[in-house]
Amino acid sequence: MSTTIPRFMVAAPSSGSGKTVVTCALLRALARRGLACAAFKCGPDYIDPLFHRRVVGARSGNLDGFFTDAPTLRALLARGAAGADVAVLEGAMGFYDGMAPGVADASSYQVARDTETPVVLVVNGRGASLSLAAVIRGIAEFLPCANVRGVVLNKTSAAACAYAAPAIEKHTGVAVLGNIPADGAFSLESRHLGLVTADEVEQLSARIDKMAELVEKSVDVDRLLEIAATAPDICEEPYRLEPIAGARPIVAVARDEAFSFYYEENLRALEDLGCELAFFSPLCDSELPRGTSALYLGGGYPELHVRQLSENAPMREAVRRAVESGIPTVAECGGFLYLQREISDSEGRRWPVVGALEGASENGGRLSHFGYVELTSQRDGLYGPRGTRIRAHEFHYWQSTCPGGDFWAQKPRRDKGWPCMTTTPSLVAGFPHVYYPANPDVARAFASAAASFAERRRHG
């Protein structure tokens, strides 16, 4: 079976080139044409997909060459884009930049190559003309199968684009699809795109409407769709895990303004395995969902909402009792900090939180242990026996006095590692974010523990 998925990737020579803005504007422009859009972010970033979903209104997921192999990438693409008229992949960093200097592993290029997705470059055209051809040709020809098919000149007037386009197309063979003017309306000031309240969503959505109008006027969207239609069919079956036998356990998933960083593929994996997801708010709810058989506390910004979290004593107590009763619990990054005794806010004030784990956290002042890690368990636990290997990602500013030591985290391709995380037969908690399609046995272990807990309670 093969799946036809018209698609293209928005990529760039470097970070800060305008990929996210152009991606969001194109998604809105395509949606306004009546097209059903699916969005993907290349790499482990969970903030841009959240922005795609909450502000642009497109379903979105991740495609990551470190986490998964090429067939799995294609299977995830097939599932995430099922029923869509077009899929838009947003690149990360520079097109060839990956997990380490000197290699293109885990880069946007790798995702484009392995999924055979046509690439549209966003290139800053200000103050250059023929030199742009050198940049574009260099990217298009640097490694094989780059599949660069189009370019949009950012921060460039229509006149400058028309002047530069013939030379670019002559020397590169890449179609110039149009320009984005140097317009203050065509920007998103905050790179912390996950920090959007309900009111901000409405305001940002209105701005993206204006961006979409600009794109329709200055970019050849019809030609872009023609390029998307040249993408080969995906031969892999859509990604799906087989359900486990037994009860249909309820997994309570924390989701509100404080906890929102989840890979959509993780939630789908748990549902595939037979779990029922019940979302709750540690900020606003007073108790866990009825029948909860497992807890999933994801990342987010608990430090920005710690006063409200701390003042919600009934929920803190409900979570503490659940964890101490042995309910299977996964707590990642912000969820991990919530389980500890205290969190300091941005002004250094300490607030008591759940207290199921020792430790307190505060702002470390900089990113710590940022990037991909390969985890190896040092003891038996919820995710598997000692020696279980897991691929994950870290991104956090807050530091804990008790980060745990039940796993060893190793930076890939680097001689750097550290102890991290806490695990027991019913708990795994720490800073790393785990991507279940990279580690399906880990997802099965969590779902199986939830099902066993539900069975014991049913017969207990």
For each predicted feature, which ranges?
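Structural motif
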Residues: M9, V88-E90, V120, V152, ...
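Cysteine-nucleophile active-site neighborhood
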Residues: P302-G381
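Internal gly/pro-rich beta-alpha loop/helix module
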Residues: S129-P243
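ATP-dependent carboxylate-amine ligase catalytic core
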Residues: S2-T115, V119, V123-G150, A158-A162
